[in-house]
Amino acid sequence: VGTPSTNSGTVNSVEGKALEDIRVVSDFPGVFPEDLPGMPPDCDIEISIDLIPGTDPISKRPYRMDVKYLAELKKQIEELLSKGFIRPISSPWGAPTLFIDKKDGSRRLCIDYRSLNEVTIKNKYPLPQIEDFFDQMRGAKVFSKIDLRSGYHQLKIRMEDIPKTAFTSRYGLYEFTVMSFGLTNTPAYFMYLMNKVFMEYFDKFVVVFIDDILVFSRSEEEHEEHLRLVLQKLREHQLYDKFSKCDFWLK
């Protein structure tokens, strides 16, 4: 997910730095874990998967997977199981799995939910227009960009909709208990969550696009206060971030 450029020329302001070396950020180590600690907390926002009336359960055969990917598939399934993000299931639902290569050379396990998405009633919650961000940031001189860690796994799925997330694999059938990458309405629900968390700071010093948070200020003194307020909100709501993908104190 992208946010507007700050024209800072900085590729990655945290490269080669430790968290404890960065002003303000060093006071919030718990917001930047190496991995998500487990299931997200209960909150009043849960993902619902409302279907077109009359829809029957959809099940697709697993895709064939090259043997060289099987060890990675098993590893990622075991990791998801250990966190409680998925669980074994016997279900009439089932979407196939595949891998997508990421920029850092790792592989993202993806579920092909296209058939489910076709029969899902679309959530029309508005996503912001990138162009609007520039008006809000006019006059700002100091910026920080915060990227949530595995953002989609930080929201739970409504209990009765969990079976619809079932996916098939060589190692069995599983269902997600948290939001899964690839479901049609996930950006809308995540935007709803972020708007609720940061609403009081909008049009002042924060813009949010799905799982990217941009903090902007007119001075370093302001930015110290603004960044601290944002990190306090993240800690309060147990929303975790990926330190290596963040940028702080850009000018």
Feature roles, as predicted:
Residues 4-251:
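Retroelement reverse transcriptase polymerase core
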